[in-house]
A protein has these predicted regions:
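Catalytic cores of enzyme domains
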Residues: 100-184
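Non-catalytic, usually N-terminal nucleic-acid engagement modules in DNA/RNA processing proteins
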Residues: 1-108
């Protein structure tokens, strides 16, 4: 399995997965039923032993609780990072109000996160089906998410940060709001 195979699998999932469309049952308004949430993703691939991952254990980055790729899976060689850009409909809708998020963006945040989880599980299974070892940290029983209460700012954190991993893999950089900025 190569990078083009992974991109093809992602493209098919984006187009055909019901998770990428707002269902009638979940739609906040009738007009949003059937709205597509994401476009095709962009990918970056990093070496599991990249020194950048070790730097994420620093308190100024993620923290000591961050698990390195080889702590998740000892045989890890490659880390796959991806970013799903919102559709124009989701992006443009959030320009309507400077205070409240749009309904479209709320669907992107909630149903969109569910889509990303399902995609991670799907891609992981495809890689395994091809005979490779694979693990999706956010779907692993060891994945932890929460607030660190023993620091001054009560940071919300996890032991695998997709946006920090994206940075190490070369997918993007950080903005002022700590979100990842990519080419798309």
């Amino acid at each position: 399995m190569n990078k083009l195979d992974i991109a093809r699998i992602a493209q098919e999932f984006v187009l055909n997965s019901d998770y990428n469309y707002v269902s009638k049952e979940n739609a906040l308004t009738e007009e949003l039923a059937g709205m597509k949430i994401f476009e095709e993703p962009i990918f970056a691939f990093g070496a599991a032993d990249d020194e950048g991952f070790q730097l994420l254990k620093n308190p100024q980055a993620v923290g000591e609780h961050f698990l390195l790729p080889k702590e998740w899976m000892l045989s890890a060689n490659t880390v796959i990072s991806f970013f799903f850009p919102f559709t124009d409909e989701v992006i443009k809708s959030n320009r309507k109000d400077n205070y409240w998020p749009s309904d479209e963006w709320l669907h992107g945040r909630i149903e969109g996160q569910n889509f990303i989880k399902e995609f991670s599980i799907f891609l992981n299974s495809k890689i395994i089906d091809e005979g490779y070892e694979s693990l999706a940290p956010t779907s692993d029983a060891r994945f932890r998410l929460g607030c660190i209460r023993d620091n001054e700012i009560n940071d919300f954190t996890s032991n695998w940060s997709e946006r920090h991993v994206a940075y190490v893999c070369g997918l993007g950089t950080f903005g002022l709001s700590k979100g990842i900025i990519t080419e798309r």
